[in-house]
């Protein structure tokens, strides 16, 4: 799921694969997937979350304790702390010599998940790592009714933000105020932020593909380009 950013100016987001599998947006951790056909749900997947840290939670907010409430919320029966992961992996490796990673076997930019498997495999004779990075993209390419409904809701939220921004545009208005109106339009109908920082460029700035400043006053005749 990746390491949390400690920059106060940036909000933390989990890896899209981790979010897809768990639904979690505010917890980092790991998930080990087993046989999905096993009739015992507790043996299908184990979710590992970081231990509670009362000192940090004084500043960042309380996190949920392990228990039925958390299990029901994420739909995963077995949830443990990451401190127990080495013991579980040691037990698993006695029954299989093949580990699969949902992250690409890339020679550079190795994910923490793959790095962990490589460390385990290096200590186990004949242990191999299989690239299964194609599985989740294949699953996500087919949308359920619930997912389609969520996509439509996102479309509606986006449309409202653009409508509000278009109505606000006028000569003398700064680009960042157009951005603020856009994001306000998202928030007021249930949006929780955008996938990336909005690009709002007027005049010549509208031709800059990844324009970032959003800090120019608009003038009469400007074409305003919004990417969000």
Regions found by a protein language model. Give the residues of each.
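General N-terminal targeting signals
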Residues: 62-66, 146-148, 153, 168, ...
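Hydrophobic beta-strand core residues of beta-sandwich domains
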Residues: 93, 142, 169-170, 218
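Short catalytic-site patches enriched in acidic/histidine residues
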Residues: 7-12, 133, 173-228
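Residue-level marker of positions within ordered structural domains that often coincide
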Residues: 37, 156, 163, 187, ...
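A charged, amphipathic alpha-helical module
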Residues: 139, 146, 160-181, 185
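Structured catalytic/translocation cores of nucleotide/phosphate-coupled proteins
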Residues: 83-87, 150-151, 164-169, 182, ...
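A composition/biophysics-driven feature that prefers long, compositionally simple stretches
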Residues: 1-160
